[in-house]
């Protein structure tokens, strides 16, 4: 069985589980490329990611997940939280079978992920222009579990876990930077949610941090007034035009691309073309 089939076997007794949008499964793909025999480990890590999304949608009051109704929108916050707890609990139960080293790697990532969720909530209370704080938050919230997935898979395959951890960390951070960009550059149909939704939710993502550095005082004030506001079409166009004027999208994309090159260089000696392809796809995607 592949890891998605293992997950279905783990959770299919719960009716609500069948309505979850599982997504790309990038963590599972990375694990099974590094070690094709680690399908169960991939299922455990993907389950942890899934549980974090269930909780994340409740925190963000998100009605949509990948273009369809979120579990909290369909069944309510209580059900979404409890389903997330069930998925987390079963994942940790299964994690014990992989031994102490892998269990510590993955459980520490969940600790970091949870910290990242909390930091994200705190940073969303007001405009954050501190790049270091933002980068630390996205490392914890997004990259830490990808880093752990690659590190744990390396342990299971007998590879250098530090090199694969570095690969995972860098593509994880790059993945989030690209997500930040897509929220601005893509439309609702492509994203499966409204465009520029991050700024409405209070998230001052990397493109906005860089834009604030470049704007005149008058334009800074205008951008601040749009914070947490449901943006009109002309307001979205103004933001996009300003991003274009200062080359913000290109700056962020270049930063993500540099992280991808670091990721590929970290594991170059292992010559695993599929991991290079995934790394490149992280930055060359539309959703």
Which residue stretches match the model-derived regions?
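Active-site alpha-helical segments that house and flank conserved acidic catalytic motifs
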Residues: 39-63, 111-112, 143, 147, ...
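Short glycine/serine- and small hydrophobic-enriched flexible loop segments
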Residues: 32-36, 89-97, 151, 155, ...
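Divalent-cation-assisted or electrostatically stabilized phosphate/pyrophosphate-binding catalytic cores
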Residues: 19, 65-89, 128-142, 189-214, ...
């Amino acid at each position: 069985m592949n890891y998605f089939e293992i997950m279905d076997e783990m959770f299919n007794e719960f009716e609500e589980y069948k309505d979850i949008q599982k997504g790309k499964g990038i963590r599972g793909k990375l694990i099974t490329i590094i070690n094709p025999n680690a399908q169960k480990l991939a299922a455990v890590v993907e389950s942890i990611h899934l549980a974090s999304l269930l909780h994340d949608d409740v925190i963000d009051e998100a009605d949509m997940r990948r273009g369809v109704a979120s579990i909290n929108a369909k069944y309510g916050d209580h059900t979404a939280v409890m389903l997330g707890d069930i998925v987390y609990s079963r994942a940790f139960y299964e994690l014990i079978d992989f031994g102490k080293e892998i269990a510590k790697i993955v459980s520490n990532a969940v600790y970091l992920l949870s910290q990242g969720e909390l930091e994200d909530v705190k940073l969303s209370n007001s405009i954050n222009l501190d790049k270091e704080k933002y980068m630390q938050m996205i490392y914890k919230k997004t990259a830490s579990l990808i880093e752990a997935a690659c590190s744990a898979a390396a342990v299971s395959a007998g590879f250098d876990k530090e090199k694969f951890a570095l690969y995972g960390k860098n593509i994880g951070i790059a993945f989030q930077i690209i997500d930040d960009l897509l929220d601005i550059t893509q439309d609702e149909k492509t994203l499966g949610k409204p465009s520029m939704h991050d700024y409405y939710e209070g998230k001052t993502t990397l493109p906005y941090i860089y834009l604030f550095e470049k704007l005149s005082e008058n334009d800074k004030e205008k951008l601040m007034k749009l914070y947490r506001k449901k943006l009109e079409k002309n307001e979205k166009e103004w933001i996009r035009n300003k991003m274009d004027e200062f080359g913000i999208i290109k700056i962020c994309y270049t930063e993500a691309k540099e992280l991808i090159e670091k990721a590929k260089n970290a594991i170059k000696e292992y010559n695993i073309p599929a991991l290079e392809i995934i790394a490149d796809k992280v930055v060359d995607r539309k959703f």
